[in-house]
Amino acid sequence: MSAVALEKEPLRIPSSQDFAAFVTRSEVEDLLYHEAELLDTWHLHDWLALFTEDCSYFVPSTDLPRTASADDSLFYIADDAVRLRERVIRLMKKTAHAEYPRSRTRHLVSNIRILAANAEEIQVASAFVTYRMKLGNSDAYVGSTHYRLRRIDGQLRIVEKRCFLDLEALRPHGRVSIIL
Protein backbone atom coordinates (compact mmCIF):
# COMPACT_ATOMS: atom_id res chain seq x y z
CA MET A 1 0.00 0.00 0.00
CA SER A 2 1.48 3.32 -0.97
CA ALA A 3 1.21 6.38 1.19
CA VAL A 4 -0.69 9.25 -0.30
CA ALA A 5 0.70 12.64 0.54
CA LEU A 6 -1.95 15.20 1.27
CA GLU A 7 -0.94 18.69 0.35
CA LYS A 8 -2.54 21.19 2.64
CA GLU A 9 -2.44 24.91 2.68
CA PRO A 10 -0.42 25.86 5.77
CA LEU A 11 -2.49 27.35 8.56
CA ARG A 12 -2.17 31.10 8.43
CA ILE A 13 -2.04 32.86 11.76
CA PRO A 14 -3.60 36.35 11.68
CA SER A 15 -1.08 39.13 12.06
CA SER A 16 -1.45 42.63 13.47
CA GLN A 17 -0.69 43.85 9.96
CA ASP A 18 -3.95 42.28 8.78
CA PHE A 19 -5.91 44.73 10.94
CA ALA A 20 -3.56 47.74 10.92
CA ALA A 21 -5.99 49.85 8.89
CA PHE A 22 -8.59 49.49 11.67
CA VAL A 23 -6.72 49.08 14.97
CA THR A 24 -3.28 48.41 16.44
CA ARG A 25 -2.47 45.72 18.94
CA SER A 26 -1.20 48.34 21.40
CA GLU A 27 -4.56 50.19 21.25
CA VAL A 28 -6.38 46.99 22.16
CA GLU A 29 -3.88 46.09 24.88
CA ASP A 30 -4.10 49.59 26.37
CA LEU A 31 -7.89 49.34 26.54
CA LEU A 32 -7.89 45.91 28.21
CA TYR A 33 -5.16 46.84 30.71
CA HIS A 34 -6.99 50.08 31.53
CA GLU A 35 -10.20 48.11 32.05
CA ALA A 36 -8.41 45.77 34.47
CA GLU A 37 -7.01 48.71 36.44
CA LEU A 38 -10.42 50.38 36.72
CA LEU A 39 -11.95 47.15 38.03
CA ASP A 40 -9.13 46.56 40.54
CA THR A 41 -9.43 50.10 41.90
CA TRP A 42 -13.23 49.91 42.01
CA HIS A 43 -13.66 52.84 39.62
CA LEU A 44 -16.76 51.15 38.26
CA HIS A 45 -18.43 54.28 36.89
CA ASP A 46 -15.29 54.98 34.83
CA TRP A 47 -15.28 51.31 33.78
CA LEU A 48 -18.88 51.66 32.64
CA ALA A 49 -17.85 54.60 30.44
CA LEU A 50 -15.72 52.15 28.39
CA PHE A 51 -18.94 50.59 27.04
CA THR A 52 -21.23 51.65 24.21
CA GLU A 53 -24.87 52.58 24.77
CA ASP A 54 -25.96 49.26 23.18
CA CYS A 55 -23.51 47.12 25.17
CA SER A 56 -23.88 43.69 26.72
CA TYR A 57 -21.90 41.74 29.33
CA PHE A 58 -22.24 37.96 29.54
CA VAL A 59 -20.89 35.22 31.78
CA PRO A 60 -22.39 31.92 30.56
CA SER A 61 -22.57 28.98 32.94
CA THR A 62 -19.62 26.64 32.69
CA ASP A 63 -21.52 23.76 31.07
CA LEU A 64 -22.72 25.68 28.01
CA PRO A 65 -21.14 25.73 24.56
CA ARG A 66 -19.49 29.01 23.61
CA THR A 67 -22.18 29.63 21.03
CA ALA A 68 -25.00 29.56 23.62
CA SER A 69 -27.44 32.44 23.72
CA ALA A 70 -28.75 34.13 26.85
CA ASP A 71 -32.18 34.07 25.20
CA ASP A 72 -32.55 30.32 25.65
CA SER A 73 -29.82 29.30 28.14
CA LEU A 74 -29.09 30.04 31.78
CA PHE A 75 -26.20 32.48 32.19
CA TYR A 76 -24.58 33.59 35.45
CA ILE A 77 -24.69 37.14 34.09
CA ALA A 78 -26.57 38.45 31.04
CA ASP A 79 -26.62 42.24 31.26
CA ASP A 80 -27.64 44.79 28.69
CA ALA A 81 -26.66 48.46 29.14
CA VAL A 82 -29.45 49.16 31.65
CA ARG A 83 -28.73 46.11 33.82
CA LEU A 84 -24.99 46.75 33.68
CA ARG A 85 -25.53 50.32 34.91
CA GLU A 86 -27.76 48.98 37.71
CA ARG A 87 -25.09 46.41 38.62
CA VAL A 88 -22.47 49.14 38.97
CA ILE A 89 -24.77 51.34 41.08
CA ARG A 90 -25.62 48.40 43.36
CA LEU A 91 -22.00 47.28 43.78
CA MET A 92 -20.96 50.78 44.82
CA LYS A 93 -23.49 50.88 47.68
CA LYS A 94 -22.89 49.64 51.21
CA THR A 95 -26.07 47.58 50.88
CA ALA A 96 -24.32 45.28 48.38
CA HIS A 97 -23.62 42.83 51.19
CA ALA A 98 -21.62 40.38 49.07
CA GLU A 99 -19.15 43.20 48.33
CA TYR A 100 -19.17 45.23 51.53
CA PRO A 101 -16.51 45.52 52.62
CA ARG A 102 -15.26 45.42 49.05
CA SER A 103 -13.15 42.56 47.82
CA ARG A 104 -9.63 43.28 46.71
CA THR A 105 -9.18 42.03 43.17
CA ARG A 106 -6.36 41.61 40.72
CA HIS A 107 -7.33 41.19 37.07
CA LEU A 108 -4.53 39.68 34.99
CA VAL A 109 -5.01 39.83 31.22
CA SER A 110 -2.81 37.97 28.73
CA ASN A 111 -2.72 36.32 25.30
CA ILE A 112 -4.51 39.28 23.73
CA ARG A 113 -5.36 38.52 20.11
CA ILE A 114 -7.17 40.48 17.44
CA LEU A 115 -9.44 37.94 15.76
CA ALA A 116 -11.09 40.13 13.14
CA ALA A 117 -11.51 43.77 12.28
CA ASN A 118 -13.36 45.90 9.80
CA ALA A 119 -14.58 49.47 9.60
CA GLU A 120 -17.44 48.77 12.06
CA GLU A 121 -16.15 46.37 14.74
CA ILE A 122 -13.09 44.65 16.10
CA GLN A 123 -13.21 41.16 17.62
CA VAL A 124 -10.66 40.44 20.32
CA ALA A 125 -9.94 37.49 22.61
CA SER A 126 -7.82 37.31 25.74
CA ALA A 127 -7.07 35.01 28.63
CA PHE A 128 -7.71 36.14 32.19
CA VAL A 129 -7.15 35.24 35.80
CA THR A 130 -9.06 37.31 38.32
CA TYR A 131 -8.04 36.92 41.93
CA ARG A 132 -10.52 37.93 44.61
CA MET A 133 -9.35 38.38 48.19
CA LYS A 134 -11.76 39.01 51.02
CA LEU A 135 -11.91 38.29 54.74
CA GLY A 136 -8.88 35.99 54.64
CA ASN A 137 -10.13 33.98 51.67
CA SER A 138 -8.77 33.96 48.15
CA ASP A 139 -10.56 32.82 45.00
CA ALA A 140 -9.29 32.56 41.45
CA TYR A 141 -11.52 32.87 38.40
CA VAL A 142 -9.80 31.60 35.25
CA GLY A 143 -11.00 31.80 31.69
CA SER A 144 -11.07 33.68 28.43
CA THR A 145 -12.87 36.81 27.35
CA HIS A 146 -14.18 37.64 23.91
CA TYR A 147 -14.80 41.29 23.12
CA ARG A 148 -16.54 43.14 20.34
CA LEU A 149 -15.12 46.65 20.15
CA ARG A 150 -16.23 49.69 18.21
CA ARG A 151 -14.45 52.98 17.60
CA ILE A 152 -16.58 55.93 18.71
CA ASP A 153 -15.22 59.46 18.38
CA GLY A 154 -11.75 58.00 17.88
CA GLN A 155 -11.84 55.85 21.05
CA LEU A 156 -12.27 52.10 21.32
CA ARG A 157 -15.40 51.16 23.25
CA ILE A 158 -16.72 47.78 24.38
CA VAL A 159 -19.85 46.63 22.56
CA GLU A 160 -19.87 43.14 24.06
CA LYS A 161 -17.84 41.42 26.75
CA ARG A 162 -18.31 37.67 27.07
CA CYS A 163 -16.35 35.86 29.83
CA PHE A 164 -15.98 32.10 29.53
CA LEU A 165 -15.00 30.53 32.84
CA ASP A 166 -12.71 27.50 32.65
CA LEU A 167 -13.86 26.37 36.09
CA GLU A 168 -15.91 23.18 36.14
CA ALA A 169 -18.20 24.80 38.69
CA LEU A 170 -18.28 27.88 40.87
CA ARG A 171 -17.46 25.85 43.97
CA PRO A 172 -15.97 26.85 46.35
CA HIS A 173 -16.67 30.39 45.12
CA GLY A 174 -20.43 29.89 45.01
CA ARG A 175 -21.13 33.10 43.10
CA VAL A 176 -19.74 35.81 40.88
CA SER A 177 -20.26 38.98 42.91
CA ILE A 178 -17.37 40.87 41.30
CA ILE A 179 -16.96 41.96 37.71
CA LEU A 180 -14.66 39.62 35.81
Swiss-Prot record:
GO MF annotation, one: dioxygenase activity
Induction of the gene: Induced by p-cumate and repressed by CymR.
Gene Ontology terms describing biological process: 3-phenylpropionate catabolic process
Presence of keyword Membrane: no
SUPFAM superfamilies, A to Z: NTF2-like
Keywords of the record: Aromatic hydrocarbons catabolism, Dioxygenase, Oxidoreductase
Pathway annotation from the record: Aromatic compound metabolism; p-cumate degradation; acetaldehyde and pyruvate from p-cumate
Quaternary structure annotation from Swiss-Prot or TrEMBL: The p-cumate 2,3-dioxygenase multicomponent enzyme system is composed of an electron transfer component and a dioxygenase component (iron sulfur protein (ISP)). The electron transfer component is composed of a ferredoxin reductase (CmtAa) and a ferredoxin (CmtAd), and the dioxygenase component is formed of a large alpha subunit (CmtAb) and a small beta subunit (CmtAc).
Family per similarity comment: Belongs to the bacterial ring-hydroxylating dioxygenase beta subunit family.
Role: Component of the p-cumate 2,3-dioxygenase multicomponent enzyme system which catalyzes the incorporation of both atoms of molecular oxygen into p-cumate to form cis-2,3-dihydroxy-2,3-dihydro-p-cumate. The beta subunit seems to have a structural role in the holoenzyme. Also able to catalyze the cis-dihydroxylation of indole-2-carboxylate and indole-3-carboxylate.
Protein name: p-cumate 2,3-dioxygenase system, small oxygenase component
Natural source organism: Pseudomonas putida (Arthrobacter siderocapsulatus)
Gene: cmtAc
